[in-house]
Amino acid sequence: MGWTVTVDTDKCTGDGECVDVCPVEVYELQDGKAVPVNEEECLGCESCVEVCEAGAITVEEN
């Protein structure tokens, strides 16, 4: 089982909260937006979804 991590770049404000909260470093900021560069490491904990005030992140089980 894996997880699909999606960031809506139109909603993303680039505050980096998801980068800071993710326990397995799925995200990094690129050009002021969060990018799930290590999606295969995602644990599905949804901490990133909880801290994203813009509602830009979705995490779905494959």
From Swiss-Prot:
Record-annotated membrane-spanning stretches:
none
Can the keyword Metal-binding be found in this entry's annotation? yes
The cofactors required by this protein are: [3Fe-4S] cluster; [4Fe-4S] cluster
Q: Which domain of life is it from?
A: Bacteria
Q: Show the Gene3D superfamilies listed in the entry.
A: 3.30.70.20
Q: How is the cofactor bound?
A: Binds 1 [3Fe-4S] cluster. Binds 1 [4Fe-4S] cluster.
* GO molecular function term, any single one: metal ion binding
Q: Name one Pfam family in it.
A: Fer4_10
Instruction: Pinpoint the 4Fe-4S ferredoxin-type domain residues.
Output: 3-32, 33-62
The UniProt annotation places [3Fe-4S] cluster binding at 12, 18, 52
User: What does the UniProt keyword field contain?
Assistant: 3Fe-4S, 4Fe-4S, Electron transport, Iron, Iron-sulfur, Metal-binding, Repeat, Transport
Cite the binding residues for [4Fe-4S] cluster.
22, 42, 45, 48
Q: Partners and quaternary state? A: Homodimer.
The UniProt function text for this chain reads: Ferredoxins are iron-sulfur proteins that transfer electrons in a wide variety of metabolic reactions. This ferredoxin serves as a carrier for pyruvate dehydrogenase.
Under PANTHER family, the record lists: ADENYLYLSULFATE REDUCTASE, BETA SUBUNIT, L-ASPARTATE SEMIALDEHYDE SULFURTRANSFERASE IRON-SULFUR SUBUNIT
Q: Would you tell me the protein name for this molecule?
A: Ferredoxin-1
Species lineage, top-down? Bacteria, Pseudomonadati, Thermodesulfobacteriota, Desulfovibrionia, Desulfovibrionales
